Amino acid sequence: MATNGHFASIGVDNDKTAYEHGVQVIDENKEFNPNISKYLSLENVTHAGFNYHLISVFGSQSTGKSTLLNHLFGTHFSVMSDSERRQTTKGIWMSKNKREGEATVDPTLRMADNILVMDVEGTDGRERGEDQDFERKSALFALATSEVLIVNIWEHQVGLYQGANMGLLKTVFEVNLQLFLKDKNTTHRSLLFFVIRDFVGTTPLKNLQKTLMEDMARLWESISKPPGLESSSVHDYFDFQFYGLPHKSYQPEQFVAETKKLSLRFREGQRDPSMDARRGEFSEGGVFLPEYHRRIPADGFSRYAEGIWDQIVNNKDLDLPTQQELLAQFRCDEILREVMIAFDEAIVPFEEKQSQSARLGEPEVLGGLGAAMRSSRAKAVKNFETEASRYHKGVYQRKRAELESKVDTRLKALLQGQLNAAHKSGINEFSEAVSSSVKSGQKQGAGYDFAEIVNEEVKKAIAKFEDVARSTVVEGTTWSDYKQELALYEKELADVSGRLRREEMRRLANRVERWVQSRLGESVGLEFNALGSGRAGGGAPETGEKPLEKAFWDRVWNVFVETVLDAERRFTDRASSFDASLEEVDVGLWRLRRKSWGVLRAKIDEEMTEGNLLLKLRENFEDKFRYDDAGVPRIWRPTDDIEGIYTRARESTLTLIPLLSRFRLAETSAPPPLDRWIGHTPSSATPADEEDLPPIGGVDEEEGKSLDEEMMILSEAKRQELTVRFKKAADGVYVEAKRSAIGGMTQVPLYFYGLLLALGWNEIIAVLRNPAYFFLLFICAVGAYVTYQLNLWGPIIKMTEAASSQALVEGKKRLREFLESSDTGRQAIAMSAGSGRSGEQYELSDLSKKGKARTSADEDMDDL
């Protein structure tokens, strides 16, 4: 004989051979086996969900319970030897139905899938004696977990109290009320299946059923019931079925046949509403009705059973609904963790990449993020729903909400990061695209519509942002609405567009200002150049008429106004393509007028520098002094009124100094209306629009200068200095003219030619008679003429002077060397040195261009 205690005890590895005879759920010492889940996994029950059934068998010790289960379900529970009577099953054992899938005559009559059978230790054994604690606890455990309770009873024990296990059944009824007392909303039902052993048929089965049901009714009436259940019936909580089996030893063939027939009753069935157990009508169909199932998923059974037994063995009030909730809490947490592991594998790489991009300050739009988010979320929710939806609905829904919250929190952060990356990269790409299009238009030289470029790029940027957003969002979630982010993106695009437009208008203004500067430089320069011409003809306009000098500033102002008006037209026409507002155009024109005035004033200051002004005054004076009214150069003669012409020309030129010293219009004898022309500061101008503008007197009140002070070109001291210097220059011109006139009066006396002819007659004849002399004279004359025509006499004279000076220096040097080579010379040199005079030595390389010794000033000039 072998006992169940020898097989698969607690702690054995999950090798399938170790569980050949089943697994011990609870040992004789009331210890729960933690390897139940391993056994269920090996038997492929863990993933069955609700598609499993649990049966427990009750009965007195040594009544053949294990034998019955082995024949019904093909299990290998240990059985008692026929040669002795003793306890075989210790504790509670469990095994899976081994006859699952066996062929039957009727294919519709087949055993249910995944039937788990629990063999409970027999009652009324001498090993435990009067200790009924384990008996009660095991009954409570079996009732809390099993759908069907098989009561193994012999026919001759029917009608007895102890022999028919009436005490055990009373315990079952009592613990049943205790078990489901706290869950009054649901009536949990179980099936009590009486298997009457050694049934010979002398007493009809119906009579045995009637006797047992009368005993059940008396037992139910005898137990104390909680308030509200006093009138309850045993049929409110239990269903009953009965089956008789022949004697195993005396009728072995009939026993085997009947057990096989009985095994087919362990299939799924439906309640027949036409049958009433109170009238003795009992079903003979499938025993597994839906209402019997405890609704504990197979993967959570081990945990649930352990929790139930812990409550039972510690004598705590067993609250099955609470246990189911605790199991649901535990299993849902486990499932949630498993689901999150798979979720992390899909999402963490994107989170790390996004985090790294954020740390580097280079936001990146992650490809494939949306598909990964949708797929991982759907898988997580689906897997959780598949595994956890079988548990307590309240716990499942709460944990599902927790899962969705965790998943959505992380996915929302990814979506936000993706939208931020699309936002920043889109803004950068938009700015670069607009700048590139503008540069391309400028290079092509053709006109380009800035507003059209901006509008086109804005459409592209928004479309790209929406594509990224749509590809990333997870449908059906409240956090996938990106309208706010899109609105912020559109707002920043508008801000950037405005900034780019202002920058482009600023560049346009700069180009227009350079154009104004160029035009004013030419036009105003011509007006100042005209001051240098004091005559008509070549120095006047093409008409030959000399412009009036007193209207000089009128012409400058008119040229300035016309140039700026032309620039304003250019600016306005170009700004219209920028879609600029009227306020922006007004600010641009206002800045253009102020900048243009600065350009004009800078040009005037450049022309009015002391050197330039003296040059123009001298040119003006010389034109009036050296040329007549027709523009013909004067040839001075002693009879000319040089003093009168000089005085008139000088006084006429001197009138220019007070004219040029102040910007004043001849028509009004007042400064030009600069303040009205520039206008007031536009209300839309910002401090940034004004910060680079220099103040203008008479326009800016805070400048503290009046318009007259702004129009002051030359101060009084400058005017006096210019007057003095000009007069000195004019006096030089006058002296030169006077010398020219007097020089024309100096002539050689006629008698000198007669004297020259008389004294040099012989030499003249000698030269004329001698061809060589004559030819030499001719060559010299031609050379002198050519030299004169080429203006080379001056350089020749300078070279001659330089050569003679160098020869003198070289002669002194050689003389010194000669003296130093003799004793007498050295003594003379020593005496000369003692007298305090040191001889000057000059090298050829130290001579200046004029043949003189080079000074430090000459060296500085050569460096420049």
From Swiss-Prot:
Bilayer-crossing regions: 748-768, 772-792
Residue ranges in the Lumenal topological domain are 769-771
Q: Name one GO cellular component term.
A: endoplasmic reticulum membrane
List the Gene3D superfamilies. Answer: P-loop containing nucleotide triphosphate hydrolases
* Chain sites annotated for binding GTP: 59-66
Region named Disordered? 675-701, 830-864
Residues folding into a coiled coil are: 480-506
> What is this entry's stated membrane topology?
Multi-pass membrane protein
BP term (GO), one: endoplasmic reticulum membrane fusion
Provide ranges: composition bias, Acidic residues. Answer: 688-701
Instruction: From the Swiss-Prot or TrEMBL record, state where the protein is found.
Output: Endoplasmic reticulum membrane
Is Protease a UniProt keyword of this protein? no
Q: Which domain of life is it from?
A: Eukaryota
Name this protein carries in UniProt:
Protein sey1
Species of the source: Aspergillus fumigatus (strain ATCC MYA-4609 / CBS 101355 / FGSC A1100 / Af293)
Gene this protein is translated from: sey1
